[in-house]
């Protein structure tokens, strides 16, 4: 019942936020990607992604939103965030497993390869973009990497 109520609420929100494009929110920078993040950066960023993915699986949009970066929150409120997830990333709400792969650093951003498997065993390759500002991690963007080079998973 909670799922149905959440889905209805989110669907209503979609009509007012359908012009939001999460891919367009990703920073467009041409700085070359450095080979890897430090072990600490990879561990901390992975823990942040894991927390958000678990919140989605537990149908807890408020907690999932709390993992977003301050810059993301400045541009999208909770209702818009829910609309983005439902319209573009509904599979996150039915995740059965996930693997967090390689981390690369680009300027002040951390790019993580993530593979999500939903309850129907469909796999989704994703790229998560995180920032760490004044010691605080945040998810800036996430996108499905359909048609791109397959990321490496450890």
What kind of feature is each model-predicted range?
Residues 51, 81, 128-129:
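Conserved short hydrophobic patches within well-ordered secondary structure
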Residues 19-58:
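Short, low-complexity N-terminal intrinsically disordered segments enriched in polar/charged residues
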Residues 26-31, 71-74, 128-131:
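Charged, low-complexity, helix/coiled-coil-prone segments
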Residues 13-16:
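C-terminal motif of bacterial Sec signal peptides marking the signal peptidase cleavage site
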Residues 37-47, 57, 61-111:
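Short solvent-exposed beta->alpha transition segments
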Residues 6-10:
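Hydrophobic helical h-region of N-terminal Sec-dependent signal peptides
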Residues 1-5:
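Bacterial N-terminal signal peptides that target proteins for export
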Residues 102-154:
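Exposed beta-sheet edge and beta->alpha loop/turn motif
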């Amino acid at each position: 019942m909670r799922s149905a109520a959440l889905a209805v609420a989110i669907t209503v929100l979609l009509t007012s936020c359908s012009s939001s494009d999460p891919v367009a929110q990703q920073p467009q920078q041409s700085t070359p990607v450095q080979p890897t993040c430090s072990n600490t950066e990879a561990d901390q960023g992975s823990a942040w992604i894991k927390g958000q993915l678990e919140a989605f699986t537990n149908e807890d949009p408020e907690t999932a939103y709390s993992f977003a970066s301050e810059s993301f929150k400045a541009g999208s409120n909770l209702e818009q965030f829910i609309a983005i997830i439902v319209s573009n990333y509904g599979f996150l709400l039915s995740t059965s497993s996930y693997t967090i792969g390689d981390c690369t650093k680009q300027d002040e951003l951390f790019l993580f390869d993530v593979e999500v498997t939903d309850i129907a065993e469909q796999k989704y390759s994703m790229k998560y973009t995180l920032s760490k500002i004044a010691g605080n991690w945040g998810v800036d963007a996430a996108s499905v990497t359909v048609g791109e080079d397959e990321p490496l998973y450890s």
